[in-house]
């Protein structure tokens, strides 16, 4: 079996899934205290890097995705599958786990 090298350009979500680059978490508190990695909360905001074609309806057509590449989104805290690529963090989510598009 040939080895596969994963990169952002090789990950293509299927169905109603979305591939999101996770935003950096805060390094310090509002009071200026530096936070160690163990004390940082998992970010819930990121930018859509790629999106699947949408959910297939009963009649065989596809429902259009509500998010598109480049959208900044807020998603559920424990949703998706975490993926690390090239030192950056990503999450593969179902579109239903996205709570809002952030402008």
From Swiss-Prot:
Source organism superkingdom: Bacteria
CC annotations in GO: cytoplasm
Coiled coil: none
GO-annotated molecular function: ATP binding; metal ion binding; protein folding chaperone; protein-folding chaperone binding; unfolded protein binding
Keyword Coiled coil: no
Main location: cytoplasm
Name recorded for this polypeptide: Co-chaperonin GroES
Transmembrane segments: none
Organism: Trichodesmium erythraeum (strain IMS101)
Pfam family name, one: Cpn10
């Amino acid at each position: 079996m040939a080895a596969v090298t994963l990169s952002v350009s090789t990950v293509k979500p299927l169905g109603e899934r979305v591939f999101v680059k996770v935003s950096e978490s805060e390094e310090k508190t509002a009071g200026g205290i530096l936070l160690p990695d163990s004390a940082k909360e998992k970010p819930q905001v990121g930018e859509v890097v790629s999106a699947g074609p949408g959910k297939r309806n009963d009649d065989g057509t596809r429902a259009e995705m509500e998010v598109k590449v480049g959208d900044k989104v807020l998603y559920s805290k424990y949703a998706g599958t975490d993926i690390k690529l090239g030192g950056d963090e990503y999450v593969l989510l179902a579109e239903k786990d996205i709570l809002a598009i952030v402008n």
